[in-house]
Structure formats: structure tokens, C-alpha cells
């Protein structure tokens, strides 16, 4: 039975997240329905990142085992045909060894968070960036962000419903870059806790507004209490952009 690796992009706005939820449609569910329409069997599609409701992906990775053999390009095209009502695109399909696991074989996950730092309302990017009207000091944000690099207990920056066994994660990158009125936060790690990226982004925005200093961010991390976190950024601006293997 061949195992297929899929690289997928999607607009997370209409979905309750990657994973099955009782409260609405999921990306996983839409993909599995498309696979079933092609091969006739119920097949589980496993994703590398369980993105939350409203979070987007430019290159989510998934794998599935299909009893019938398909040429990878034919599988890709067939899935896209059945996914057409949804804002989901299968970019590539390839046959991989059966030892490959989209989630557990991943070496690093890369996310980008986009902020529109402007007074004007959004006309084009509604649902795809976080509009922050007050000016942000991105140099202060970037400097403070470096306090979070490395291995830490990120209890402060994880959702209270996070199911990870340990709150310890190693953060490899957290950069804040401005290009005009667009502020981009780039982060990478082998894995992240539930809501960790959005929690870090919201706290960095407090730094950008001058409400917190870099020391305040460090102190919040050290407290290891969810209540010590700043605001949680909305999902609109968050994108899973790459998974390394």
C-alpha cells in the first residue's frame, strides 16, 4: 500500500482548524472526503501541524496510505478537482517510504505572522493579517523577541487546553521585520505548543506599544503562568509556511 506525501495550502478562515472538531468543518475532513471520492475508501490524512481555527498554510505537509496506486500527479489533480468548493489546494503529491510520518518525521516547522500596522481599514487582506493601528516599535520588538530564543518552559505562552506532555520547547528563531506598514514575525522550532506563536506575537505587540519592556517579556516567561501572558493575537495573520524533513 503506497504512502503519499501531500503539500497543501489553505485559507483557514472557513475552517475550525486542521483537525476534526465537533463545531464545524476541518481541513482534515475536507481532504479525507476528497481522498474517499477518488479511491472509495475511508482514509485518514495525517498533518504535520494541527493549525487552529482561522490559521492559514502555504505549505502544510500531510501523509496518507491509499490501497490503490496512483501516479502522484494524477492524485494531486484528482484531489484538487474534488476540493474545488473549498479554499484548499494540493500543491504536490509524492510517494514516500512507509516510515515517513508527516508529524513525527518533521525536523522543524516555520511560521510567519503578518501585521498591517496602519490606521486605514483593510480592504484586500481582511482575514489574512492582523491590523494594528497604533505605531509599533519593531526594533524593540525584535530585541525583546531574542529573550525567548532557546529552550524554555513556555507555560506562559501556551493555551490552558494544550495537551502537550511538557511545556518545554526549543525556539530556534523569532525575528521581527518591518517593510513599510507590514510587520512580519518569523519563527521556527521543531514543534510549538497550542497557541504559542499567537501568544508570543500578542506579547511582542505590547512591547511594540511600549506597554512592556524586554525585561517584562522575560519576567512573563519566567513566571510560567498563563495569566502572565499578554494578549493572544488573532489567527488571521498566522501562516504555516514550511516544514523541514
Swiss-Prot record:
One of its GO terms (molecular function) is RNA binding. Formation of pseudouridine at positions 38, 39 and 40 in the anticodon stem and loop of transfer RNAs. Belongs to the tRNA pseudouridine synthase TruA family. It catalyses: uridine(38/39/40) in tRNA = pseudouridine(38/39/40) in tRNA. This is tRNA pseudouridine synthase A. Keywords: Isomerase, tRNA processing. The keyword Isomerase applies. Its EC number is 5.4.99.12. The gene is truA. Homodimer. Disulfide bonds: none annotated. It comes from Nitrobacter hamburgensis (strain DSM 10229 / NCIMB 13809 / X14). GO terms for biological process: tRNA pseudouridine synthesis. The active site is at residue 52.
